[in-house]
Amino acid sequence: MAKIILDENKLLYADNRKSWRAWLKGHYRTGREVWLVYYKQHTGKARVTYNEAVEEALCFGWIDSTVRRVDEDRYAQRFSPRKPGTPYSQANRERLAALIAKGKVAKEVLATLGKPAPKRFRVPPDILAAIKADPAARNNFRKFSPSYKRIRIAFIDGARDRPAEFQKRLRYFLRMTAKNKQFGFGGIEKYY
């Protein structure tokens, strides 16, 4: 597989949330993309956390996507303006609800949001049946936090129009849940 070389002119290092927000504030209207640099832990360099980076990006109508290795000490994640009309993930709806309540979302962006607030959460019947069919998964699922359940189930359900991907996500979730293991990013718990 060919190694992807990142354009050094599009790399941005923000050592904290405030500097990342300042960059977004100055570029969200005209910027097309930026690769936010995260230094690896062994370097000891300060950095904005993933959750902070996503929250600030949402405040300015941007979203996160691909992650690429830069070198031995760094990796970078692509951020770009969100395409109008694309749906928000469950995690981002929950983040946005909290950010709106705190008055952090830019007014221009707020006017375009519509209603990104969290939807009432229900486990789809087919996913619930799959969980119930595995006694270990069923028992462990009951113990997981409501936020974790919402995020993971929404992720699985988001692939419903791609049956192979839907099944792959569901099988992985069931396997991990049966082992009583949670996976994915952290930090979302603070919204509850």
Where are these regions (language model features)?
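Charge-dense, helix-prone N-terminal extensions
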Residues: M1-Y192
